[in-house]
Swiss-Prot record:
S-adenosyl-L-homocysteine binds at Y20, C61, N66, D102, L103, S146, Y147. GO terms for biological process: methylation. Because cv. Delprim is a hybrid line, AAMT1 and AAMT1I are likely alleles of one single locus. However, AAMT1I showed no enzymatic activity with all tested substrates. Belongs to the methyltransferase superfamily. Type-7 methyltransferase family. SABATH subfamily. InterPro entries: MeTrfase_7, MeTrfase_capping, SAM-dependent_MTases_sf. Pfam families: Methyltransf_7 (PF03492). Mg(2+) binds at E268, F270. This is Inactive anthranilate O-methyltransferase 1.
Amino acid sequence: MPMRIERDLHMAIGNGETSYTKNSRIQEKAMFQMKSVLEEATRAVCTTLLPQTMVVADLGCSSGPNTLRFVTEVTRIIAHHCKLEHNRRHDHLPQLQFFLNDLPGNDFNNLFQLIEQFNKSSTTHKGDAATEALQPPCYISGLPGSYYTRIFSSESVHLFHSLFCLQWRSQAPEQLKGTQKSCLDIYITKAMSPSMVKLFQQQFQKDFSLFLRLRYEELVSGGQMVLTFIGRKHEDVFTGESNHLYGLLAQSLKSLVDEGLVEKEKLESFYLPIYSPSVGEVEAIVKQLGLFNMNHVKVFEINWDPYDDSEGDDVHNSIESGENVAKCLRAVMEPLVASQFGERILDELFKEYARRVAKHLENEKTKHAVLVLSIEKAIIHV
């Protein structure tokens, strides 16, 4: 069955050992790193707008515990702001309406179960005057759909958030279909022709521009966006950390082709719908459109192995780290890979991938480059 983004682009479902729920520590660490940026943007909404009902949307929410961590954090920031700035009573706090958005293939059933647990936990605090006085009323809804389309009415959202999503494209470049690969790569490499590399870059420019235009229509005046996603540290498109990460996956798939477990034709037609941009590329599009004021942009790094918190250049156990990296990537890539090559290869593929990552980490400790962008809807004078 051919891969379809709307159907197949979602994280591994359920609560099993290979699920996204059990393997989303990198995203959790990124959320911790961008906490101050989220707080600044949320406070800006509170200070300049503070509506009776604040609408907050998490785009590409997935289904793990990080989604509810975001809800909890925004609620905490708003409650703290209202207490410090206004000393508001509970009945004067703004109501919070959260929309959790992802593609229809997302594990919304698991997400709704987490929401139910969250609501029950919040209910247990009712009757505790000290806690309840600080807790704004909070309502949470799921919203299936692509954020590369309009998903909200005009000027209805106060704060947009997205974590580890905007490296995903709406599709792999259309012009790559039917082209003959000189190599069996699935993402940008130095062996790829300049014209093919340019197609990946153009797809990013098209998608990111569309995303910003859509959100501009949906944000209220003064509304904020905090976007955190995988990028690269350098302007050179061939030096990105993602090139190594996905290059090792391509090598693992090639080895399965050699073993007769994967059809060569299927690998020849497979490209990842991904592009990891530089800060310069992101800034250029924001400035070119002129729809948003840029509050903040920065790059931070996270070790490939989410359980390696060390800051040095040495990997203490490359085999264990290789397995950890493979689990994280499988939780993200499994549905896409399975739709193209079949589920039966998954265990063997990611076993081979773990081995190759371990060998890579023996020679070079590699980190994800993560971009954080905070922008505000600009007032355009006609």
